[in-house]
Structure formats: structure tokens, C-alpha cells
Design a protein with these regions (language model features):
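Active-site acidic carboxylates
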Residues: 1-104
């Protein structure tokens, strides 16, 4: 490749690559979601090798929230903090900072 995408002034954000979204057993699983893992890991490696910051977001909900259908929202229970579903997919390289969102519902 002739174009360098990353340097020390760049950043890469990996968004919500968690078990509940990426694993077929997850409560909000995206069909074929884990198939993009090699591409994500390659981008993370390229960014890291070129000095870019790599950060990760993580959906991180309390057990009860108006966000969930059982509590009046529209979404199934997912990414409840401290559960398997909320964990970053085990094959995802995640050595950078994490930003947890949805922490208040």
C-alpha cells in the first residue's frame, strides 16, 4: 500500500466489539459480526505500529434501565456491566484505553 493511514497524530476507535454484538450467542448478535475480526485486528496492528492511539468503546449498562424492553424501552437486555455479554470479544486485541458508554441507562 502506498498510503499510510496512521501516524502519531491519528487515532483509531474500535466501537463496541463485544460478545453481545459479535458472538452468535450474544443477545444482540449481528449475523457474521465476528467475520470482520481479522480486519479489525489488522487495522489495530497497523495503527499501533505507526504510533497512532487506539481506543475502544464499550456499551456498559446497569442491570435495570429504561433502555431495555423489560423496563419500558425497545432493546433486549444486552451488555450488562460485569457480564460475559459486556466483555470485549476474546479475539479482539484491546490494549488501549476503553470508554464505557450507556453507564447511566
Amino acid at each position: 500500500m502506498g498510503v499510510q493511514r496512521y501516524d502519531s497524530r491519528a487515532g483509531l476507535i474500535v466501537v463496541d466489539f463485544q460478545n453481545d454484538f459479535a458472538d452468535p450467542a450474544g443477545s444482540l448478535s449481528v449475523s457474521g459480526g465476528a467475520s470482520i475480526l481479522p480486519t479489525i485486528n489488522a487495522e489495530v496492528a497497523a495503527a499501533t505500529a505507526n504510533g497512532a492511539l487506539v481506543a475502544y468503546t464499550q456499551d456498559w449498562h446497569p442491570e435495570s434501565t429504561p433502555h431495555f424492553a423489560r423496563d419500558g424501552g425497545i432493546w433486549p437486555v444486552h451488555c450488562v456491566r460485569g457480564t460475559w455479554g459486556a466483555e470485549i470479544h476474546p479475539e479482539q486485541k484491546d490494549d488501549g484505553p476503553r470508554v464505557r458508554k450507556g453507564t447511566n441507562g
